[in-house]
Amino acid sequence: MMQLFKTAKADIATDAIRTEDENNPKGYYELEAVKGIVKNNAFLKELDGKTIKIVAPLVTFIDLSLEYRVVFMIRDLDEVLQSQEKMLGKDQQEQQEKFRSIYTLHVEKSRQFLRANNISFIEIQHRELLEDPETCLQNLMDFCSWETPLEELKSVIDQSLYRNRKNA
């Protein structure tokens, strides 16, 4: 997703502390300050007009005095769990049900928060973006007011990075 923002020439807020690795060869595009958003969200005021990556559990801590347009990327839970297991390098079978309920709760809580606070958002299903990029990208382009040609955005989607694919 962040590669799409980069291609669309969005101003991405990142500190490049977490660099690309074998799990994410295109990089993470993260901002260290986001990890502390629960205690301090003041940094968001300095990021007006920028694109920032915030994981679902932390969305509910954003500064409500600011305006947002949220692109909510939803990944298949089994694929998330498989990816986490590979990144951590250990079998997570015992913890998977716990993670499953926590993940589901965070996603739903984030949706409710966005709706309750009238924050404009679009949900993009990770699998759909890969399987039907034209439709997803057109929706994303409309939502973000991107003028980047569809084909240019489509060229960014790298199927080889979809390594933790659940069978349909």
Which residue stretches match the model-derived regions?
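PAPS-dependent sulfotransferase catalytic core
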Residues: 1-50, 158-168
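Short, surface-exposed acidic
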Residues: 13-17, 145-156
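Generic secondary-structure boundary/loop-capping signal
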Residues: 25-26, 78, 126-127, 154, ...
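PAPS-dependent sulfotransferase catalytic domain
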Residues: 51-149
